[in-house]
């Protein structure tokens, strides 16, 4: 009689342990699935350090490299703090520049020099110098929109548009430029001046909004693609500008000033 009872208890224990093991396996698989889905939908873990850029970049979709053919974004022009020295900040959208030397950009400049502030819009086709847009009078608080679009791939024709939504001023041009289209960026930069990386102007903070791009046959906000955050640091890894997570709409983020140099 005792032997029978012992066998029954042993069987119950085995069944109980199997149930616990199966439950733990299911929970583990569910947790891994959640982690995988979270990374796919919001892969904000990858951060690239740069001495001159702060923002976000898209250079691949899943594990395949992409070819960007259009990009746009908007921002409110920040006011920079006036100093006796020379300090600079550039805000722009661009195509290329991470994986090769081709880079086409459109944006605004916010500089402080000799106790004065300077604001203007521009576009640039690397390696040529930036072209200043004199038909738009930029002021702090103006909402700017910039876009780049490949309109004729056969002859590498790009359309560049910059508009001041606050004043209604607009600039547009079409240029020939051989870009690989290997990446798309939304960047706040301390630009190179006289072959040296400039001192970063105190811009407070700037929010990029409505950041979208088209690559191959896909169009969407930053979060529709695999992306990387770019943190601006100096040569000894001191943070100069911080970059927020991308908003829930997948298209907005904020860059904040931390330190001049």
Where are these regions (language model features)?
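Exposed, interaction-prone regions of secreted/extracellular proteins
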Residues: 34-261
């Amino acid at each position: 009689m005792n032997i029978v009872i012992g066998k029954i208890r042993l069987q119950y224990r085995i069944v109980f342990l199997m149930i616990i093991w199966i439950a733990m396996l299911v929970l583990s698989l569910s947790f891994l699935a959640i982690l995988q889905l979270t990374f796919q939908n919001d892969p904000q873990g990858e951060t690239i350090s740069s001495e001159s850029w702060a923002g976000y970049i898209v250079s691949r979709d899943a594990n395949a490299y992409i070819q960007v053919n259009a990009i746009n974004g908007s921002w409110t022009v920040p006011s920079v703090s006036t100093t006796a020295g020379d300090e600079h900040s550039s805000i722009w959208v661009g195509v290329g520049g991470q994986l090769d030397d081709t880079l086409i950009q459109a944006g605004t400049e916010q500089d402080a020099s000799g106790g004065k502030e300077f604001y203007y819009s521009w576009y640039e086709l690397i390696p040529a110098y930036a072209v200043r847009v004199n038909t738009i009078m930029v002021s702090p608080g103006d909402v700017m929109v910039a876009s780049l679009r490949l309109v004729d791939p056969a002859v590498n024709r790009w359309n560049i548009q910059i508009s001041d939504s606050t004043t209604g001023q607009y600039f547009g041009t079409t240029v020939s430029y051989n870009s690989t289209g290997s990446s798309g960026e939304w960047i706040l930069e301390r630009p190179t001046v006289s072959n040296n990386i400039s001192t970063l102007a105190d811009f407070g903070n700037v929010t990029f909004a409505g950041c979208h791009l088209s690559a191959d046959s896909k169009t969407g906000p930053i979060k529709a693609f695999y992306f990387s955050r770019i943190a601006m640091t100096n040569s000894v890894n001191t943070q100069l500008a911080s970059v927020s997570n991308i908003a829930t709409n997948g298209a907005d983020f904020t860059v904040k000033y931390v330190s001049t140099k």
